[in-house]
Structures are given as structure tokens and as C-alpha cells.
């Protein structure tokens, strides 16, 4: 009987030791989440710092539209030619949902209201800039969506997708019009007029982006 009790006690102790050993090899989920969040935050901050160097004038960027390297002052001179062009405001925002920031700069000509925007983003180790007219990026929202207007041919709401050296719209809802037809779309699918206006109302209700004085 003593021998049986002894063997049973030994087996229990071994089981406990094995259990502890297995548990010690299981990584902490909390630790993994913390490390991922830390990496994401550092990634965002690093890119934002590079973009901020450009808007402060401490560094340059490559203009896709002018196809040359410019400072912000150079850009305003090149953009305006005979007009007085100024950057009046900016917003830090993730336009294409890639977990990295872009900076959108608001442009005025001759002290008039917004005439367009310059979008700065980090690509392949450097900062590049894309020009947008006012009608290409109307009423920018905090989630990166906005309205656009190409006359009666095509108008609606979208977000941006950046390609190798350009950009394109990912259309959320839009309406196209010809001489005899008006067609409504949501996410690329034809829908009823009522469904379209419901999507428009949802977009209009979104919080606007926070603009900071430049």
C-alpha cells in the first residue's frame, strides 16, 4: 500500500511539473497585442515626423504633378506662377486605410477660399506629393472619405487608393448622368435612387476632419 501511495504521489508531482513547463512556453496574448500596438504607433509617428519635416520647410518632396523635387515654398511659387499661392491649413489623416498617415495641405490663391489640396505621403523611402483640385476632394471626413464632382457626368463620395505613381477613387456612392439617363451606384453596384440618397445621408453625417492652422 505504501508503495502504491508513493507511486501515485510521484505521478501527481510529475504531472504538475509538466503542466508548469507547458504553461511557461505559452506566450502572453497581452504581450503580443502590446508589441503590435507599439510597432503600429512607432510606424505612424516615424512617417508623420518625415512628413512634418517637409511642411516645416526642413526637407523636400517629389511632386508627381510637376515631376521634380521641391520645398513647400518652391511648390507654392511653381503652382501659382503669377498668382499668390499659400498653404493655409493642414490635416493629418490616413486617406487609404493602410495604417500610415498622409498630410493634406489646403491651398488658397490670392487669399480666396480653398482652390485645391496637396497630399503628402511616404513612398519607397521618401515623401511624394499629389495635387488635387477643390472639386476632387470636397468636404474631407475624419475617416478619409470625401465628396467629388465631375459635373453631371459623375459625382459622389469616395476614398483614395494610391497606385505605384498615381491615385484612383474607390467610390462609395455616386451618380452618373447622360442626356437621357441617370444611374445611381453604391460600391460599384447599381442601386435605386432611395438607396443612393441613404448612402449620401450617411456620408454627410460623418465627422469632418480636424484642420490645423499652417
Q: Model regions: which residues?
A:
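Positively charged n-region of N-terminal signal peptides that target proteins for export
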Residues: 1-6, 11
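C-terminal motif of bacterial Sec signal peptides marking the signal peptidase cleavage site
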Residues: 16-19
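Acidic, small-residue rich beta-repeat scaffolds with periodic aromatic anchors
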Residues: 22-61, 145-214
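Blade-edge motifs of beta-propeller repeat domains
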Residues: 32-84, 125-136
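Beta-propeller blade termini
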Residues: 86-95, 136-145
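Acidic/hydrophobic-patterned starts of short beta strands in beta-sheet-rich repeat architectures
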Residues: 97-107, 143-147
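Structural motif
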Residues: 112-118, 155-159
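Extracellular C-terminal loop/segment signatures of secreted glycoproteins
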Residues: 115-140, 167
Amino acid at each position: 500500500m505504501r508503495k502504491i501511495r508513493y507511486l501515485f504521489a510521484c505521478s501527481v508531482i510529475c504531472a504538475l511539473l509538466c503542466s508548469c513547463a507547458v504553461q511557461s512556453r505559452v506566450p502572453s496574448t497581452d504581450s503580443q497585442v502590446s508589441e503590435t500596438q507599439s510597432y503600429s504607433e512607432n510606424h505612424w509617428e516615424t512617417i508623420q515626423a518625415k512628413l512634418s519635416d517637409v511642411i516645416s520647410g526642413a526637407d523636400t518632396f517629389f511632386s508627381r504633378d510637376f515631376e521634380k523635387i521641391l520645398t513647400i515654398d518652391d511648390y507654392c511659387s511653381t503652382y501659382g506662377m503669377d498668382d499668390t499661392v499659400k498653404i493655409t491649413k493642414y490635416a493629418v489623416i490616413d486617406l487609404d486605410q493602410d495604417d500610415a498617415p498622409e498630410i493634406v495641405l489646403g491651398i488658397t490663391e490670392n487669399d480666396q477660399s480653398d482652390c485645391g489640396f496637396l497630399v503628402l505621403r511616404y513612398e519607397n523611402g521618401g515623401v511624394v506629393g499629389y495635387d488635387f483640385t477643390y472639386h476632387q476632394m470636397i468636404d474631407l471626413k475624419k475617416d478619409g472619405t470625401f465628396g467629388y464632382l465631375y459635373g453631371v457626368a459623375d459625382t459622389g463620395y469616395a476614398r483614395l487608393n494610391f497606385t505605384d505613381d498615381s491615385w484612383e477613387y474607390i467610390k462609395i456612392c455616386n451618380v452618373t448622368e447622360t442626356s437621357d439617363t441617370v444611374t445611381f451606384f453604391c460600391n460599384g453596384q447599381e442601386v435605386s435612387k432611395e438607396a443612393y440618397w441613404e448612402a449620401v445621408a450617411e456620408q454627410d453625417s460623418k465627422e469632418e476632419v480636424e484642420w490645423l492652422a499652417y
